[in-house]
């Protein structure tokens, strides 16, 4: 059985994760560090680490950092060492093979941690066992090794997120401390022990970032807090919903661009008071009488209309972008996955024809899972129809079409107007593909490399032009249009002429 240490240290400068070889748990020695000075308090804590009563755990083969923790297997024994903002030392011991868990140096932080653990020990589907009389608990009661391993993983996840939250509060000030505390509390409360998944934890502190792949329980925010917080799907950080829209749906913790509704995107891009929608009353009538054993197509359309307040998966219209008149269409992934049916294709085609006649620059914001299967070949025809209208707009009229690819952009949208822009812009970390990862793997029986369908990877393959963050997008579009001789309206001049 291999024994490992996982070490975490908080300083007032940054959250560090270090690794070093060590022979004895009682004599770790100072840790090498090239970025900040050594912490004598931490070193003293390490040297005086509690000697666990289990004789087979007194020697440690090596010390591992966060980057190496994903290499631990289920038979590893490891200890989590840390120090909170009061510089109190504490350690958490896991022996997965012998199913032992313990906490040393109990204080307020650990009491909260133990309280969280106790809910697992007392859960109805696990058999209770005896506790030792030692200062730490000896839980050797699990007849379900799979359940034990999953829970150990969730404990590590909870610990890492709490440490990162404390570090963020130290770096950004006392105001965010309460927010990170609430974030840790809600994330812990929202843990669902009945489901497991594959999650990615990512953070950045003073330019130092790391990634952790792990199996953990579902960490979705519970319905209880959903009206207050928006949880990032990448780092699981919580963003205050009241300010999330003003932040352009960008996670404050890791900078990930979360999905936006079409209405929010229009508000972000178009000048206030200039938006004039087109074809709002157009909706699908189930042209092929699509048969579904679950929910009829018409009923499904009605439910999405009530849910989103939209009639279809795209909004089209005319507006001004920093004073420049533009024709813009914005797809909405919340409406049936942004799928392209006959109505979506017709609205886009009419928008392109209007922009052609009025000599307006064109913007199409893509967010779609592809062609809508409920409309069969009629949805596939939209690809050719839109491409034909774009040919007249671009080749004959020599006008400028900007395609903006957001996450996700897949299927028939990628294969048609998504990739036909004179300038193709992608959002950071956008998922862009023709066939999705699951479809490729099930069809070809081959594994799709991680990240091979992400915007950053595809950018280096020359698939599109720039990757532009949302907070810079409006300015970039304005400069591009002016470069192509589309200038803001001069309102003073127009008043004089009239």
UniProtKB/Swiss-Prot annotation:
Gene3D superfamilies from the entry?
2-enoyl-CoA Hydratase, Chain A, domain 1
What pathway does the UniProt record associate with this protein?
A: Lipid metabolism; malonyl-CoA biosynthesis; malonyl-CoA from acetyl-CoA: step 1/1
Question: Per the UniProt entry, what are the Gene Ontology biological process annotations, in alphabetical order?
Answer: fatty acid biosynthetic process; malonyl-CoA biosynthetic process
Zn finger (C4-type) start-end? 232-254
What superkingdom does the record give?
Eukaryota
Locate the CoA carboxyltransferase N-terminal domain: which residues? 228-498
Q: What class of enzyme is it?
A: transferase
> In which residues is Zn(2+) bound?
232, 235, 251, 254
Question: Catalyzes what?
Answer: N(6)-carboxybiotinyl-L-lysyl-[protein] + acetyl-CoA = N(6)-biotinyl-L-lysyl-[protein] + malonyl-CoA
Required cofactor(s): Zn(2+)
InterPro entries, alphabetically? AcCoA_carboxyl_beta, Acetyl_CoA_COase_Trfase_b_su, ClpP/crotonase-like_dom_sf, COA_CT_N
GO cellular component labels = acetyl-CoA carboxylase complex; chloroplast stroma
Q: Name one GO molecular function term.
A: carboxyl- or carbamoyltransferase activity
Tell where it localizes. Answer: Plastid, Chloroplast stroma
Q: Does the keyword Lyase apply?
A: no
Any matching Pfam family: Carboxyl_trans
Give the co-factor note: Binds 1 zinc ion per subunit.
What HAMAP family is this protein classified in? Answer: AcetylCoA_CT_beta
Q: Which family does it belong to?
A: Belongs to the AccD/PCCB family.
Give the protein's biological function: Component of the acetyl coenzyme A carboxylase (ACC) complex. Biotin carboxylase (BC) catalyzes the carboxylation of biotin on its carrier protein (BCCP) and then the CO(2) group is transferred by the transcarboxylase to acetyl-CoA to form malonyl-CoA.
Question: Sorted alphabetically, which NCBIfam families does this protein's record hold?
Answer: accD
Q: Give the PANTHER family listed for this entry.
A: ACETYL-COENZYME A CARBOXYLASE CARBOXYL TRANSFERASE SUBUNIT BETA, CHLOROPLASTIC
In Swiss-Prot or TrEMBL terms, this protein is called: Acetyl-coenzyme A carboxylase carboxyl transferase subunit beta, chloroplastic
């Amino acid at each position: 059985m291999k024994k490992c240490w996982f070490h975490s240290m908080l300083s007032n400068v940054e959250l560090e994760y270090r690794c070093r070889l060590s022979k004895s748990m009682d004599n770790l020695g100072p840790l090498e560090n090239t970025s900040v000075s050594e912490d004598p308090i931490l070193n003293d804590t390490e040297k005086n680490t509690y000697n666990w009563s289990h004789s087979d755990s007194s020697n440690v083969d090596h010390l591992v950092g966060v980057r190496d923790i994903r290499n631990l297997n289920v038979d590893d024994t490891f200890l989590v060492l840390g120090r909170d903002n009061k510089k109190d030392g504490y350690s958490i011991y896991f022996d997965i093979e012998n199913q032992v868990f313990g906490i040393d140096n109990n204080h307020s932080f650990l009491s909260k941690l133990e309280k969280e653990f106790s809910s697992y020990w007392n859960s109805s589907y696990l058999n209770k066992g005896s506790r030792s009389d030692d200062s730490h608990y000896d839980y050797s009661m699990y007849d379900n090794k799979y359940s034990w391993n999953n829970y150990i993983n969730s404990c590590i996840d909870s610990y890492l997120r709490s440490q990162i939250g404390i570090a963020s509060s130290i770096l950004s000030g006392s105001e965010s401390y309460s927010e990170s505390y609430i974030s840790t509390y809600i994330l812990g409360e929202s843990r669902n022990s009945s489901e497991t998944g594959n999650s990615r934890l990512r953070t950045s502190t003073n330019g130092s970032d790391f990634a952790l792949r792990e199996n953990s329980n579902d960490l979705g925010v519970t319905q209880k807090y959903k009206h207050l917080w928006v949880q990032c799907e990448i780092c699981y950080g919580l963003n205050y919903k009241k300010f999330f829209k003003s932040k352009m749906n960008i996670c404050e913790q890791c900078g990930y661009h979360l999905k936006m509704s079409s209405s929010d995107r229009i508000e972000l891009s178009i000048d206030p008071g200039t938006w004039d929608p087109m074809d709002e009353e157009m909706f699908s009538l189930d042209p092929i009488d699509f048969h579904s054993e679950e929910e009829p197509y018409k009923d499904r359309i009605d439910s999405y209309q009530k849910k989103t307040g939209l009639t279809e998966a795209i909004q089209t219209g005319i507006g001004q972008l920093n004073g420049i008149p533009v024709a813009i269409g914005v797809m909405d992934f919340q409406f049936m996955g942004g799928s392209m049916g006959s109505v979506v294709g017709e609205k886009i085609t009419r928008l392109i024809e209007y922009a052609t006649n009025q000599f307006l620059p064109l913007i199409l914001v893509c967010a779609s899972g592809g062609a809508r299967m409920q409309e069969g070949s009629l949805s596939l025809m939209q690809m050719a129809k839109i491409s034909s209208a774009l040919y007249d707009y671009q080749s004959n009229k020599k006008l400028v079409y900007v395609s903006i690819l957001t996450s996700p952009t897949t299927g028939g949208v990628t294969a048609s107007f998504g990739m036909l822009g004179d300038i193709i812009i992608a959002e950071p970390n956008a998922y862009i593909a023709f066939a999705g990862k699951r479809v490729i793997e099930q069809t070809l029986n081959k594994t799709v490399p991680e990240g091979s369908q992400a915007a950053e990877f595809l950018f280096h393959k020359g698939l599109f032009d720039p990757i532009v963050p949302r907070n810079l997008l409006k300015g970039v579009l304005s400069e591009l249009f002016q470069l192509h001789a589309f200038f803001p309206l001069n309102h003073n001049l127009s008043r004089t002429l009239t």
